Amino acid sequence: MNNLPRYQFQNRAAGGNCIGMLLTGGKSKRFGSDKLVHTIEGQTVAELSAHALSLACDTCFEVGLGLTGLPVIHDSSGQGPLAAIAQSVMYLRDQKILEFGQCALVLAGDVPLITASTLRIVANWPGRSSLVPVVNGREQYLAARWSPESLDRSIFLTKNGLMKVSKALDVSGTQRLSMDAWESQDNQEFLDIDTPDELRKLVNAELICIPDRRSQS
């Protein structure tokens, strides 16, 4: 991972020409209930994720259950995130909202610490290739910019019954971005919430600062 490109983190303008896609259709099996509707300082986990995405992209959609106030594309497949992405791509292209040469900024709904400034960096990275943040050696496929080729591949894979998200990003030109600002244990911006204990630790550590999010608009 040492050869990955690095970037100086700074506030940037809204996310280029990317369409924002927030995924809220997960079943939260490990959490035991719908983790996306749990509240933190008066906002749900999904709303916090949606707020950051909406500040990073001019046009955003929620793909799933309609939990955030964003325009909703209902996930009728129930087959996981890749199928939800593929369904959304087909719908948005059919409605002439997403152009065939346009990228999407894809974000899971359970990352309430993510900030608009970080998402802008991913969305605005030079070029139109897929860009996958790498945090502590882990590739963040669902906090990534998906190229037109990766979006096309999501459709191809799901039509053939292949649902592994990483395979859609296995296309020529995909870049990995080392997020070196996350080497500190104190910064957990890409943390996704899979269990009630993880949510309690996050809240008790006071890692979320909602006023800071609003100041990024």
Model-predicted regions and their roles:
Residues I210-S217:
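Long, low-complexity, intrinsically disordered segments
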Residues N3-V165, D170-Q188, D197-I210:
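Nucleotide and nucleotide-moiety/phosphate-recognizing core
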Residues L191:
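Dinucleotide-binding Rossmann-like beta1-alpha1 core, especially the glycine-rich loop
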